[in-house]
Amino acid sequence: MEETKAKILKVLTAIPQGVLYSTTDWHRILGADKRDIKHALDELESEGRIKVVKSEAGRSDKPLYRLKEAN
């Protein structure tokens, strides 16, 4: 799980601020199991390191994720 979280944060810090990714996008990028990715994303959100965005264009059951802006 820690390896997946590190990979997610590496990708998010390398892309422009505000770009959104879905769990399926993460599966394509990392090649990891979607359930492991979802657990890693949930942990990162609970740690306050990423933000979950409910997109108007996306499905309500498929949240999008982005790096949390520094305050």
Positions of the model-derived regions?
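Short, cationic-aromatic polyanion-contact patches
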Residues: 1-5, 53-71
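Positively charged, polyanion-binding regions of nucleic-acid-associated proteins
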Residues: 3-17
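Short acidic, hydrophobic short linear motifs in intrinsically disordered regions
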Residues: 17-29
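Short amphipathic alpha-helical interaction segments
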Residues: 32-43
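A short, conserved structural fragment
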Residues: 45-55
